[in-house]
């Protein structure tokens, strides 16, 4: 009986060691599940990605604006891709390929909704890492001015390793 317990403990420790040595990989454009952080330190965490349909879901934790808190808000969205089109002799091909992405957040009791639409591709101008570059629109029901219900800007999300 003691030998069986000792064997179980040794096996358990070996499995624990293997699991601890497996490093989590940062998300990529083709495997987007994971955390992505923008310049304001807000984080979108893509928890599920269905490659067949392109559906994504997860959570967004904002560190800017009225929604700044540690409370995560639900994210829904889509990714879509077509195969890269190589250049052909005598034909101006499309020389850059990117995954396309859109995701939305409803800010609950705050009443607003934000949507990001853009691309996920390698940023050749900086680190060479993949990143999400998107434009965003935020709509809010209560503002000081009629023109202030929809705000627009741009954002960049880098993978968190």
Regions found by a protein language model. Name each.
Residues 27-124, 136-138, 158:
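Central antiparallel beta-sheet cores of small beta-barrel/beta-sandwich binding domains
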């Amino acid at each position: 009986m003691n030998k069986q317990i000792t064997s179980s403990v040794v096996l358990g420790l070996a499995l624990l060691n293997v699991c601890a040595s497996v490093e989590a990989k940062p998300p990529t454009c083709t495997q987007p599940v994971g955390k992505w952080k923008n310049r304001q330190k807000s984080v979108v965490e893509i928890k599920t990605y269905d490659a067949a349909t392109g559906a994504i879901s997860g959570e967004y934790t904002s560190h800017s604006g009225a929604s700044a808190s540690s409370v995560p808000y639900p994210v829904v969205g889509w990714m879509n891709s077509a195969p890269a089109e190589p250049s052909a002799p005598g034909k101006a091909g499309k020389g850059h390929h990117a995954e396309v992405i859109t995701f939305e957040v409803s800010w609950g009791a705050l009443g607003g909704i934000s949507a990001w639409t853009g691309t996920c591709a390698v940023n050749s101008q900086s680190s060479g890492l993949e990143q999400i570059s998107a434009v965003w629109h935020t709509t809010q029901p209560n503002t000081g001015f009629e023109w202030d219900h929809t705000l627009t800007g741009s954002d960049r999300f880098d993978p968190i390793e």
